Amino acid sequence: MYLDTKNLTASSTSALTAATASNSKSTRRMRNVWKPLSRLLKVGGKGRTAQATLAHPNNVDLNNTQQQQQQQQQELLIEDDTKSTPEESIHKYGLELRQLPEEEQVSLTQPPNTPTLISSVHVDKVSAQSCGNCQHGRNCQHRHHSSSNINSSSSSSNMNSSSATQLPSNLWDLQLPLQYISTDNGTFFWANTQDRVDDDLLHALLCQSFSQLPGTLC
């Protein structure tokens, strides 16, 4: 059998060259396709690191970002409070109170029907025994018992006892520092002492001597 070795060698060489050329072309084509994909897969692009301060990172659930922002703001506020002086803190607290809605603000005004304390009273001094002959008896509302000027004040608790009538000491079995004034609105009693007076004892004491005092006591 005759073999054409020359042509056989040439054909095999050309086949290998064609296969190598096709393989190199496909490799280059795959490389051109893969490079852009690899760039897209890298976060931040080639040669740059991912920014950690993004509002919505790619690997974080968007529903959790709002809570993280609130926590960061609270931490910043705490740091600012620790660095600020007491005067600045008071000023900032006042500004926050002004920004509160009206229903959330604490009402500093007194509610209606708030009891007030008498700070000063002017009365005409008349002895209690002068009411003994009064036709009204224990319900005496004689004009010399009326007060001509009553100033009520809720900010002062000091009584002006010099202008009031002192009860005679012989009316009481117990020596209590009691004083009273009789006005058109009724008879008012108080004690010039810092110690608390028993209300029940005071009421019983006044009821025993109601006949010698103006106004209805019991």
From Swiss-Prot:
Keyword flag Glycosyltransferase: no
Biased composition (Low complexity): 1-25, 147-163
Matches recorded under Pfam families: ESM4 (PF15952)
Keyword rRNA processing annotated: no
InterPro entries referenced in this protein's UniProt entry, alphabetically: Malpha/m4/m2
Disordered: region residues: 1-30, 64-86, 137-164
One GO term of the biological process aspect: Notch signaling pathway
Effect the entry attributes to changing residue 47 to C: In strain: NVIII-9
Gene: E(spl)m2-BFM
UniProt keywords, alphabetically: Developmental protein, Differentiation, Neurogenesis, Notch signaling pathway
Protein name (database record): Enhancer of split M2 protein
Function: Part of the Notch signaling pathway.
